[in-house]
Amino acid sequence: MAGNDWINSYLEAILDVGPGIDEAKGSLLLRERGRFSPTRYFVEEVVSGFDETDLHRSWIRAQATRSPQERNTRLENMCWRIWNLARQKKQLENEEAQRMAKRRLERERGRREAVADMSEDLSEGEKGDIVVDHSHHGESNRGRLPRINSVDTMEAWMNQQKGKKLYIVLISLHGLIRGENMELGRDSDTGGQVKYVVELARALGSMPGVYRVDLLTRQVSSPEVDWSYGEPTEMLPPRNSENMMDEMGESSGSYIVRIPFGPKDKYVAKELLWPHIPEFVDGALGHIIQMSKVLGEQIGNGHPIWPAAIHGHYADAGDSAALLSGALNVPMLFTGHSLGRDKLEQLLRQGRLSRDEINSTYKIMRRIEAEELSLDASEMVITSTRQEIEEQWRLYDGFDPILERKLRARIKRNVSCYGRFMPRMMVIPPGMEFHHIVPHDGDLDAEPEFNEDSKSPDPHIWTEIMRFFSNPRKPMILALARPDPKKNLTTLVKAFGECKPLRELANLTLIMGNRDNIDEMSGTNASVLLSILKMIDKYDLYGLVAYPKHHKQSDVPDIYRLAAKTKGVFINPAFIEPFGLTLIEAAAHGLPIVATKNGGPVDIHRVLDNGILVDPHNQESIADALLKLVAEKHLWAKCRANGLKNIHLFSWPEHCKSYLSKLASCKPRQPRWLRNEEDDDENSESDSPSDSLRDIQDISLNLKFSFDGDKNESREKGGGSHPDDRASKIENAVLEWSKGVAKGPQRSMSIEKGEHNSNAGKFPALRRRKIMFVIAVDCKPSAGLSESVRKVFAAVENERAEGSVGFILATSFNISEIRHFLVSEKLNPTDFDAFICNSGGDLYYSSHHSEDNPFVVDLYYHSQIEYRWGGEGLRKTLVRWAASITDKKGEKEEHVIIEDEETSADYCYSFKVQKPNVVPPVKEARKVMRIQALRCHVVYCQNGNKINVIPVLASRAQALRYLYLRWGMELSKTVVVVGESGDTDYEEMLGGVHKTVVLSGVCTTATNLLHANRSYPLADVVCFDDLNIFKTHNEECSSTDLRALLEEHGAFKA
């Protein structure tokens, strides 16, 4: 292609740089001046959303080529590259539009089906927009208090709370968290969320009625970060709390508690923490149990003080909080801060990356699944703004605003929701600490003076900033954000550089975190910073723009004060801002604001009315708003006054009052067996039950000897009854039956003594075991389960004979199938201490008390997992879904999925799969249930031939945590034995503080069938480099080889 010099001009137009551009040439925004260039408009549209840095670099290299022919060839290739990028972007946009249309149809269909199920008693009241908040348990909120706006009301409320002594757990996992000198902006993980959770913990700990607050995070003992992040515990002293902490206890107050998990001696990004979440959950569980006992001794009369709530912040902490709340049976709260689906849609709209590339970079699908689980498990979701609910949470399968209003209306009328649940969305704006704010008492109409009297030196950070300016007395436009593309700082610099009146009237200060060397920054942040530096050079902004390299967190108030002293303006031009805490800080220092119209700033501006909202994509709008506030003194003064007048509405006491009032509306929950023990003062104990007469009587009272439950009988007589009612009836019946045991204590004692001497009274023997082996090999009994069991038994034969090791069988089978397996393989039920059945839906223990029924079901385990169990309403929806699979696939000759009533149980609905290859992946089944507000855990098992549906927080891994909580079974002294693959809950069994042995060559057939079409690859959630996960060397591994492997990895001493 000869003579194509036009290409260079074309690229110059795209990049707006190069020798062909001079000062007389118009800016990119020709439309500002009333002229319109179709060519320029096309160029802007083509490269919209693409990073210009790479294009600029390629263009420079092409320009430097001496040979005209080679230069033209390179430039032509660049044009084709740009065209291809635009084509890919358009293709991605079309695919995304189709996906969104499909999603809308699925949601509408799910909503119609849910409404149809509940149509028996619909009324006009459900059709209105009911705004009264109720808990999902149907309790009224008469005890909830109005918003406090006066000192008298606040004092009255504080006096009312003094009798309470709450223990609250907050979780925020990623970033670097400490109480003082926070390194905000150090990296993308250490931002506003870190400051928010620290200040929230500190403020809650200062409130009346709150005894202790623990902020759980990751312990980082790495040479690349400060030593303080490796300290196990850090106290957060309260600020200005003379009137709020009248009664201090030994362990009261707020604390940062750092739990070790993940790579040791290494600080890693949040995207790499997902495989280590189970390890954190196990460590946090141990801390909470220990702290509950300590607090019980101090303020609970010897009874454990369980958390009033566990509050997860961001998706990773939400996932952890869900597992912890399920293990402890306590309420969960969630705050998203930044949501995965919203980020995914933004990245797809930009067109730079495909969906697979986005997932690979950000682990976005794992993050979204964690957020969906948080919706499933949360009693309440706390948001900063209404926009977060209406535009971001509604993107999720588990939340539908329309269906949520209908469910709320039914709860208000005390009408059944047929097993459907929706978390309550609560808007509680973040608070702010005002103790460090020094009001500006000077004459606001006078010229700013900087240390002219030398009575007190100016803050050091003022000098650092003003050294950049040729005229430091001009009003300062202040932006405080890390150099992240979504913060949109490049558009701000471009708007400032292209608006001559603004440059003449004001200076620009960019506080972009801390840096030592640009080359050592992350690639994205370095790219943004380089772009800004190039624009400063391009527009010749030297002497007009400050960009200091370092600042401390304690310098931030002084930076705001400097901007206010110069009668400046604070700007947040982010493309979307979840809340905008810096806007509140700026307002508190008397700074008017210019902020993005997308997200939380809309709500802040509605309350404060102290500035102007702008379109972050329109640099002309940004420049005009800044110029207006800087040039019009009366407007500036009005915005300043409005902000200072209304800022008290964002104080931390106000936030905490709303927080605690909402928390009071949640139904209290705690481990059921401990609650019953506390009701009986004669037999109450602070610790888990011990192996004594008291425990044997408890077992007889609280555990039903059974081999095959009467599951179908309750369904025939009225399956709509709540699981609580059925459990209570069973327990009452067993109570009546066991009266004879209570009347004969002497006989019971002699039985216990005899059984103990003969080693027959084994239950609950798992407390006495030094090591527990959990066999969770997911294959048919005839296909390797029996061989695996015998191999493990043989590997620890000596310890097994001594009784120092115990065994648990964890499978998808029900208790009938397990008994058949034991009989057929000539194994004794007492070879195992416990049986986790139905994928975690049931828990049994072996017993010596009855040869006919050698299994004891733990009814309290049911009370632990029944949270949000949909019961008969869920079962009917599952049956309808199973029937729809047949219709959609056109398989008229036989059903693809049929209900298996024989193997179903009260807390596990089972389905037989006739054609595993036809059934949609498990993620689709979970999606269908969530769209209809049904919360459950769907597990594809037995190589795809069976589906188990159990309560949302039930699983085999959670059952192990229950055994730790109730019986003290040490998870760190547990070995889980699995195959190379397994059921769809396989990944949950791998991570944690326990050791995991992967048997080579076992359960290999399930890999492609069950784990195809996963939402995310297994490597995103399992760290196979973990030292606690080890694999046998070959398929022919003998029991001797297994023993040697266990000794090598520290399970046994050699």
UniProtKB/Swiss-Prot annotation:
Class in the EC hierarchy, top level: transferase
Catalytic activity: beta-D-fructose 6-phosphate + UDP-alpha-D-glucose = sucrose 6(F)-phosphate + UDP + H(+)
GO molecular function ontology, one term from the record: sucrose-phosphate synthase activity
Record bears the keyword Transferase: yes
Region of interest (Disordered), ranges: 104-125, 674-693, 708-727
UniProt note on regulation of activity: Activity is regulated by phosphorylation and moderated by concentration of metabolites and light.
One Pfam family per UniProt: S6PP
UniProt biased composition (Basic and acidic residues): 104-115
InterPro entries recorded: Glyco_trans_1, SPP-like_dom, SPS, SPS_C, SPS_pln, Sucrose_synth_GT-B1
EC code: 2.4.1.14
Pathway in which the depicted protein is active: Glycan biosynthesis; sucrose biosynthesis; sucrose from D-fructose 6-phosphate and UDP-alpha-D-glucose: step 1/2
GO biological process, one term: sucrose biosynthetic process
Record CDD domains: GT4_sucrose_synthase, HAD_SPS
Claim: Transferase is one of the keywords in the record: yes
Keywords: Glycosyltransferase, Transferase
Record-stated family: Belongs to the glycosyltransferase 1 family.
Cited function: Plays a role in photosynthetic sucrose synthesis by catalyzing the rate-limiting step of sucrose biosynthesis from UDP-glucose and fructose- 6-phosphate. Involved in the regulation of carbon partitioning in the leaves of plants. May regulate the synthesis of sucrose and therefore play a major role as a limiting factor in the export of photoassimilates out of the leaf. Plays a role for sucrose availability that is essential for plant growth and fiber elongation.
NCBIfam families per the UniProt record, alphabetical: sucrsPsyn_pln
PANTHER family, A to Z: SUCROSE-PHOSPHATE SYNTHASE 1, SUCROSE-PHOSPHATE SYNTHASE 3-RELATED
Subunit structure and binding partners: Homodimer or homotetramer.
Protein's name in the database: Probable sucrose-phosphate synthase 1
Organism placement in taxonomy: Eukaryota, Viridiplantae, Streptophyta, Embryophyta, Tracheophyta
